[in-house]
């Protein structure tokens, strides 16, 4: 008889973006992209949602960060 898998009914923890007031002082704005900033050598997108900024996970390429920003913006337009 096989042992049952442990923790079958474990909740799925989904990624919740942190709400930040604004890109920090040391972030460098990338002119080529609408929402992308360079932060500690990684590319991070910040988008204004209502009164607060939403921050993306850190990406190694700026295109990914911008794609994330576009996607989140689209999702929020649909949600509203």
Swiss-Prot record:
Function of the protein: Activates the cell division inhibited by chromosomal DNA over-replication.
Family of this protein: Belongs to the CedA family.
Keyword Metal-binding: no
Assigned keywords, A-Z: Cell cycle, Cell division, DNA-binding
Stated name of the protein: Cell division activator CedA
Source organism of this protein record: Citrobacter koseri (strain ATCC BAA-895 / CDC 4225-83 / SGSC4696)
GO biological process: cell division
One Gene Ontology molecular-function label: DNA binding
């Amino acid at each position: 008889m096989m042992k049952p898998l442990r923790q079958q009914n474990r909740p799925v923890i989904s990624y919740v973006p942190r709400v930040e007031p604004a890109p920090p002082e040391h972030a460098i704005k990338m002119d080529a992209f609408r929402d992308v900033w360079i932060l500690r050598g990684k590319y991070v997108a910040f988008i204004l949602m209502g009164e607060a900024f939403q921050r993306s996970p850190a990406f190694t390429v700026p295109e990914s960060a911008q794609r994330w920003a576009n996607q989140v913006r689209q999702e929020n337009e649909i949600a509203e």
